[in-house]
């Protein structure tokens, strides 16, 4: 039996988290949402996490800091950044650290789903 992938959303925008939850569940994913990097880390990320959708600007620890910490403590969880603040330097930094994609808010559903599909492909 094939497990349904778990997509974790870390974004402080409740409305966006709820919208992503609805979209991702509608196409068959399991979804878990967190309002901050700290809340996500306190929940102790599991190996079940197939992909992380992550905002850059978060209260407390930002998305790039979370990406760095996860690389040290949890190996490689595929990360897709979704942000309203994607400048070239931030985009380059995220991609150099292993992000699958950096998408700008608002991002078309098709672009997001394509990025998730790419993140879930075996490497």
Report the location of each language-model feature.
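Short amphipathic alpha-helix used as the core "switch/output" element in two-component signaling
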Residues: 64-75
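Two-component/phosphorelay signaling modules centered on CheY-like receiver
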Residues: 14-32, 119
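Acidic, metal-coordinating helix/loop segments flanking the phosphotransfer/catalytic sites
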Residues: 33-51
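C-terminal output helix
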Residues: 89, 107-117
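The feature encodes the CheY-like receiver
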Residues: 17, 59, 87
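Acidic catalytic/metal-coordinating carboxylates
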Residues: 35-36, 62-65
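Active-site residues of response regulator receiver
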Residues: 52-55, 83
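Alpha4 helix (beta4-alpha4-beta5 surface) of REC/receiver domains from two-component response regulators
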Residues: 65, 86-101
């Amino acid at each position: 039996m094939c497990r349904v992938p778990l997509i974790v959303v870390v974004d402080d925008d409740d409305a966006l988290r709820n919208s992503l939850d609805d979209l991702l569940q509608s196409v068959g994913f399991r979804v878990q949402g967190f309002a901050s990097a700290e809340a996500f880390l306190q929940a102790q990320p599991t190996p079940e996490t197939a992909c992380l959708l992550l905002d850059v600007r978060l209260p407390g620890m930002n998305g790039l800091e979370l990406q760095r910490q996860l690389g040290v403590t949890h190996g490689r969880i595929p990360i897709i950044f979704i942000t309203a603040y994607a400048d070239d330097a931030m985009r380059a930094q995220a991609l150099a650290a292993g992000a699958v994609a950096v998408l700008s808010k608002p991002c078309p559903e098709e672009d997001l789903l394509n990025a998730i599909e790419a993140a879930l492909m075996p490497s």
